[in-house]
């Protein structure tokens, strides 16, 4: 069984006109028994980066993106630059289809379609690496 250590983080409210809406983090930290702290979606899907994208551009498209779904958001405002308890910065990059993909330390991040929550199956496979938070 994976040891889960979810960070509790209070996020500032985003003021839109006179209404306030809480910003949900695009990613959390959880502790995997084998890899230690890794970056994951709020549903505990491990997040990966691909070394072919060392130029900070999107290269995983089409069939690649079906196997490695990108973590996307509706707007840049949905992504805080920093998340409590996670060293590094978040941002977004525009995908070729126009959607905004979440980045971590300027690298686009992805899940792996064949993994269940809390699984890490593809670290160091074909240039894909789980985002380790050490």
List each model region and its residues.
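Bacterial N-terminal signal peptides
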Residues: 7-15
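Hydrophobic membrane-targeting alpha-helices
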Residues: 16-20
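Compact beta-sheet-dominated domain cores in extracellular/mature segments
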Residues: 21-134
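Positively charged n-region of N-terminal signal peptides that target proteins for export
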Residues: 1-5
